Amino acid sequence: MAEHNLLGKAGEDAAVDYLERHDYVIRHRNWRKGHFELDIVAAKNGELIIVEVKTRSDTDFALPQDAVTPQKIRRTVIAADTYIKLFQIDEPVRFDIITVIGKTGNFRIEHIKEAFYPPLF
């Protein structure tokens, strides 16, 4: 596996650990349907939380959350809609971003709640 892929997996693992420490229940990781993927699907307090994880070794070039473009938001919302319909979920939905910066074992994590809202298509 390429080094950037290893960093990404370590970042997702760190994000899951963070969420579990904060009493989130992880429903799925890397859930896929067709071409769509959700990094983490979690639940807490009767709410479904869709989490996009962005991992970077540093912020010299840009902030990790800057990689969540309007196109990425659109794809995430479509994937979430597919997930909700497939599993017949009737709960409020929230879209979060977790940024993971640093090296494995020494990550800095930021949880951005309600990072974006579903756009109108």
UniProtKB/Swiss-Prot annotation:
Stored InterPro entries: Restrct_endonuc-II-like, tRNA_endonuc-like_dom_sf, UPF0102_YraN-like
GO MF entry, a single one: nucleic acid binding
Family named by the database record: Belongs to the UPF0102 family.
Identification of the protein by name: UPF0102 protein BF0634
